[in-house]
């Protein structure tokens, strides 16, 4: 910096101190200018905080955000492609559900249901990734550009104007000691800077409908996300309801213990057992129908709910007398006749065609 430049900086600093400490009054700016300056300052602070809060809204885990930022920075330094995206909570939940759904298998109700919901969560995570990209492209990036370009430019103009104001006020206090031309030039420079700053602030505030459009893009992106999320959740809800209906329509299975082991204490003779004297007790054959006539064995208990139905217990042998239709048999048990559902029994001797 030249000697003249250093001298000018010293004069500005002297004027600033005299205003702050000594109570000297500087050139006043008009109310319209100060109001525009206030609105620009609020806009600048709003843009910074809203960008930060939007990122927190989309990516709520601070540890994951920090890790992702570090990975992307390292990838950029190494000249690699952009690293992995933010790990959505829905994707993590989907992985767990799909894993245990596979482990449980198709033989139970819970396993396939876990797989259904896991797939839905996976779809939700993909829709959430789309939301992230949409909001970044149409909301965060434009705000970042507004901050880095327009607002920064305005701050530069205001700073330059303030420096020229201090220079003008310093020279104005020394009017008579300085050439009039020097004072006139200082005033012209101050007015010029004030006009540029005022014009840039006016243009920014006048075009704030652009920020409204960016807000609209944010809301539209969220609306689209929630529409797709609703469709995904409705589909999986329908699947789960179907599974519940199907399971409730199935006959209730009763636990039937297997025959217990017994010890054979007999000695002598040919022992045909090869397991150290341990044998399994045999289940007695249920009394009921003769096996040389059409009959069936009850797989479950059946409680008659309507007149004409035949009740029985699991394991009962029922004599078959007739097939009413594809869903019902007619049979006899303990001297009583009635109807019962086909899917409750296992055919031992079929009815003749």
Swiss-Prot record:
GO terms for molecular function: lipid binding. Residues 291-350 form the SH3 domain. It is found in: Cytoplasm; Membrane; Early endosome; Presynapse. Pfam families: BAR, SH3_1. Its main location: cytoplasm. CDD domains: BAR_Endophilin_A1 (cd07613), SH3_Endophilin_A (cd11803). It comes from the Eukaryota. GO terms for biological process: endocytosis. This is Endophilin-A1. The lineage of its organism: Eukaryota, Metazoa, Chordata, Craniata, Vertebrata. The gene is SH3GL2.
